């Protein structure tokens, strides 16, 4: 027999939706937008690391 806990009682409403699928696209477009923004963020970080993005007055030294 499973033991009841306060955390389990708080999380039970989330688990009650398990297996239910909302018809249509749902939040897929929103996920696509956030994936695109994350890609832009990663590209900016990569350009700073490669020093191909020049920032005025900002020097980057990777040596120890």
Curated annotation (Swiss-Prot):
Belongs to the PsbH family. One of the components of the core complex of photosystem II (PSII), required for its stability and/or assembly. PSII is a light-driven water:plastoquinone oxidoreductase that uses light energy to abstract electrons from H(2)O, generating O(2) and a proton gradient subsequently used for ATP formation. It consists of a core antenna complex that captures photons, and an electron transfer chain that converts photonic excitation into a charge separation. InterPro entries: PSII_PsbH, PSII_PsbH_sf. HAMAP family: PSII_PsbH. This is Photosystem II reaction center protein H. It comes from the Bacteria. SUPFAM superfamilies: Photosystem II 10 kDa phosphoprotein PsbH. The lineage of its organism: Bacteria, Bacillati, Cyanobacteriota, Cyanophyceae, Oscillatoriophycideae. Keywords: Membrane, Photosynthesis, Photosystem II, Thylakoid, Transmembrane, Transmembrane helix. It comes from Rippkaea orientalis (strain PCC 8801 / RF-1). One of its GO terms (cellular component) is photosystem II. The chain crosses the membrane at residues 29-49. Pfam families: PsbH.
